[in-house]
Amino acid sequence: AAKPAPAADAAQPAAPDSQAAAGPVAKPAADGPAQADPLAESRSYEGALALFRGAKYTDAIAGFKNFLKTYPASTLAANAQYWIGYSYYALKDYKTSLAHQQKLVATYPDSPKVPDALLNVATNQIELDDMAAARKTLKDLVAKHPSTPAAKLAARRLAAIK
């Protein structure tokens, strides 16, 4: 798919790639209070993702929050957090979206979703007319994750909002 022009980019959150969004399913923890069911875990995540893809954002948020409550140690937890933030963005609730994307960065600092989450943080800051914070977030993203697609988009957005 073609990328939108840089000016149009500024109003869009990072578009996740479907393979990265799905990710691997976590293995059950042998020492946990109860054995996780990998199939149930996958169904829970995929069900919430299907709601998001169907533009049922409020239901998707509930589904992803339930997923995080049920499977807090899942390898998909960061992705679920990402989709919660993205869903709030789709609902134009930029403050809540911002908080959830920042939570992803703080809670899952080593997740491959961090660069996209930072791009979404900046996108929400732009929507909230906090250009100074958006510039700082974009600069930090480029500096900390320079080889990522999100950093390349961040550099274009940074040039567009200077």
Question: Would you name each region that the model predicts?
Answer:
Residues T70-L76, A106-K113, V142-K152:
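Short solvent-exposed coil/turn linkers within tandem alpha-helical repeat scaffolds
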Residues A1-G47, L51-F52:
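Acidic, proline-/serine-/threonine-rich low-complexity intrinsically disordered segments
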